[in-house]
Amino acid sequence: MTSISIDQPIHVIGGGLAGSEAAWQIAQAGIRVVLHEMRPIRMTEAHRSDSLAELVCSNSFRSDDAANNAVGLLHAEMRRLNSLVMRAADANQVPAGGALAVDRDGFAAAVTRALAEHPLIEIRRGEVDGLPPADWSNVVISTGPLTSAPLAAAIQALTGEDSLSFFDAIAPIVHRDSIDMTKAWFQSRYDKVGPGGTGADYLNCPMTREQYDGFVAALVAGDKVDFKDWEKDTPYFDGCLPIEVMAERGPETLRYGPMKPVGLTNPHNPTVKPYGIVQLRQDNKLGTLYNMVGFQTKLKHGEQARIFRTIPGLENADFARLGGLHRNTFLNSPKLLDSQLRLRAEPRLRFAGQMTGCEGYVESAGIGLIAGLCAAADAVGRALTPPPPTTALGALLGHITGGHIETIDAGPRSFQPMNINFGLFPPLTEPPTHGADGKKLRGPEKSVAKKQALSARALADLDRWIADAVRVAAAA
């Protein structure tokens, strides 16, 4: 790697998914990087190691279907931009039906190793407990949902904005050999085959109507973690609701959510349709650990063990990790950040990852990727044109930095975190109306064709952007 002669390195604060990706992109552009990570000097309430890019919640990067799914499209775009996160994910994938899931320890180790071995990256362990020094002229702040209190307070004082917060919950992990396979079975929903998968990638635990009703009642009645006074009004992110909160919304809610009994047949009793099904997904490459899909929870640990062992097949479950809560903090990005993710009040500071209001592993890494490219371009005195809004990266960036609706029905509307989805993309100029066979598209076929057209447009536009903007900026 050829180093570009610049007096000051770029500082990246936070070694999660976004910070790791940002540091990688900057270094790959030939610019020195100092990556600051406070762990293990100071740990968070959710992390368990000092690894960079540690996955705290699920081990799933969600769908890898670039033609039909927005997050799969985001995967494809990041791969085209030589994403370290996607490279490590692909190298450490585990079977997960149509999803891309990873061995979390192998993934974090791969990212950590790549960054530690890069000649232009210096990793500094220690907390940055306030605004970066004035002589740090180019900074990416990617400290994530668990930003330390001193740094969060300094950012709040600088911006004059109250931080917005919500809670994410973490799902339990079970040792595979403690699951009773006379009751559970392997099958992906609708036998779908995904990257590294076979169509039989999930463990399924069936419930009768009586078992389901008793389970829901136990979730609602179980003892939960108490909130501190300052936490009581903090909402949950809808994409990561605790299982018991979903249960409180109605007795049938879980049957239309993570416990839906569709696309699966119990080989132990094939003529009887389960009333509800609990799925577990492989969590490590060895296949020794499985996480409970959609079972993030704020139940107390004793209650988790008691209630989850009433699930058929999990009566003797040995839990490698029980569920828990962690708090997320993010900026009012449309108001505070420009299109380059720079803080309007102090442009030397750029933000990336979940702090900006994107939600999800891949989304955080994607925004880290863009922040890294922008910071590298700034370092050589050349602004990088943002990716087109027709791409997944551009659509997500647009939501964060300006696509948010400030008012609705003459009232204020708060900025909330967002996963990538096709609703963020500009509509097609000419939506598909007929299939390859010439027949008029209707219903689900029309929806599928629209998604495929959006994806095809995105990848074509991304390729042009890489050629016209990224390579030009890199050559400056």
UniProtKB/Swiss-Prot annotation:
- A cellular component annotation (GO) from this entry: cytosol
Compositionally skewed regions (Basic and acidic residues) per UniProt:
436-447
According to UniProt, the reaction catalysed is: uridine(54) in tRNA + (6R)-5,10-methylene-5,6,7,8-tetrahydrofolate + NADH + H(+) = 5-methyluridine(54) in tRNA + (6S)-5,6,7,8-tetrahydrofolate + NAD(+); uridine(54) in tRNA + (6R)-5,10-methylene-5,6,7,8-tetrahydrofolate + NADPH + H(+) = 5-methyluridine(54) in tRNA + (6S)-5,6,7,8-tetrahydrofolate + NADP(+)
Q: Where in the cell is it found?
A: Cytoplasm
Region span, Disordered:
428-447
Q: Which EC numbers characterise this protein's activity in its record?
A: 2.1.1.74
User: What molecular functions are annotated in GO for this chain?
Assistant: flavin adenine dinucleotide binding; tRNA (uracil(54)-C5)-methyltransferase activity, 5,10-methylenetetrahydrofolate-dependent
What name does this protein carry? Methylenetetrahydrofolate--tRNA-(uracil-5-)-methyltransferase TrmFO
Q: What is the gene called?
A: trmFO
